[in-house]
């Protein structure tokens, strides 16, 4: 699989990434979906574009929890377009929760790195190669996106906790095993456990774009949930 | 030990030290200036912590980056994606 094409991308980063990642590195993106019929094709297209432009070996695992809006149909069309070696459909009958979605997805993942992100375009897949680069740079076990450092930021005020992270597969398996909370609190708990287990964590500044900016999303509910989650973690870890 | 337990322990130790010193239970004769500072210390520390927290949050909110470029870029890429996918046979 010698890569002698030099004209595909003017960026030296592409060759840099190819040289540094070994032939065996493969990145599995886990995309749990629920009613993402409109967003799913877009995020898959952007992911494919980012990975192809950087010459990264990847697969995208779509875990749909019986979405009533036909997300699964769209996923099947994407599988036909991009191939079943790149788009893996592993749906479930009904909404069974995020944690179990990740476990289910990981069982079918053939990559040695797992990327977890939301399917609703809250994070742009263009950052994924940066995550990969950062991970190689510091040999990190986990790389997390942050809106608060560097040139990270937001467009639109959505307080929902959106998380995008890259994990070594065995690290994610270990952490999921140890975590006990439910919902998005468990994503927070994963970082707490990771620190307890002395895993190394890197950060990449990312931008979050709220596509439906203009609709008010500031809800006290979200703040309350976050504080409750924080207190729960404080008292249990 | 959970973080909560650690904090409770720490507060218990500091609290009992402060109480012992301010009530003279240890029989120590502290100079008056020390006693004057020691007595309101917990309240003072609490208020300072609150001010620091509010100040930090305020500063961070004020300096939060606004990504207009990212929003524009995303919108144009969405157009591109829809066109390309439609060409490849995706029925939206």
Curated annotation (Swiss-Prot), chain B:
Membrane spanning residue stretches: 8-28, 37-57
Compartment(s): Endoplasmic reticulum membrane
Pfam families, alphabetized: DPM3
GO CC terms: dolichol-phosphate-mannose synthase complex; endoplasmic reticulum membrane
GO biological process: dolichol metabolic process; GPI anchor biosynthetic process; protein glycosylation; regulation of protein stability
UniProt similarity note: Belongs to the DPM3 family.
Protein name: Dolichol-phosphate mannosyltransferase subunit 3
Organism: Pongo abelii (Sumatran orangutan)
């Amino acid at each position: 699989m010698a890569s002698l094409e030099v004209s595909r991308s003017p960026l030296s980063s592409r060759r840099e990434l190819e040289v540094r990642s070994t032939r065996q590195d493969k990145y599995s993106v886990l995309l749990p979906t629920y009613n993402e019929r409109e967003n799913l094709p877009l995020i898959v297209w952007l992911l494919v574009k980012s990975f192809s432009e950087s010459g990264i070996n990847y697969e995208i695992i779509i875990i749909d929890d019986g979405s009533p809006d036909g997300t699964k149909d769209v996923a099947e069309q994407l599988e036909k377009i991009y191939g079943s070696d790149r788009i893996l459909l592993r749906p479930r009958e009904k909404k069974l929760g995020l944690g179990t979605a990740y476990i289910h997805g990981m069982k079918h993942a053939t990559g040695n790195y797992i990327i977890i992100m939301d399917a609703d375009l809250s994070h742009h897949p263009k950052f994924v190669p940066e995550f990969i680069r950062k991970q190689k740079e510091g040999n990190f076990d986990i790389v997390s996106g942050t809106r608060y450092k560097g040139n990270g930021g937001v467009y639109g005020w959505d307080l929902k906790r959106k998380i995008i992270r890259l994990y070594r597969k065995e690290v994610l398996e270990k952490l999921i095993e140890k975590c006990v909370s439910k919902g998005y609190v468990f994503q927070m708990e994963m970082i707490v456990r990771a620190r307890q287990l002395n895993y190394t964590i890197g950060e990449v500044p990312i931008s979050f774009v709220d596509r439906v900016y203009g609709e008010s999303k500031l809800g006290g509910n979200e703040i309350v949930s976050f504080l409750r989650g924080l207190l729960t973690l404080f008292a249990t870890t | 030990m959970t973080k909560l337990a650690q904090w409770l322990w720490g507060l218990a130790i500091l609290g009992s030290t402060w109480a012992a010193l301010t009530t003279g239970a240890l029989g120590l004769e502290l100079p008056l200036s020390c006693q004057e500072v020691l007595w309101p210390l917990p309240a003072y520390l609490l208020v300072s912590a609150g001010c620091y927290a509010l100040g930090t949050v305020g500063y961070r909110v004020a300096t939060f980056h606004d990504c207009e470029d990212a929003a524009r870029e995303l919108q144009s890429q969405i157009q591109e994606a829809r066109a390309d996918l439609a060409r490849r046979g995706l029925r939206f």
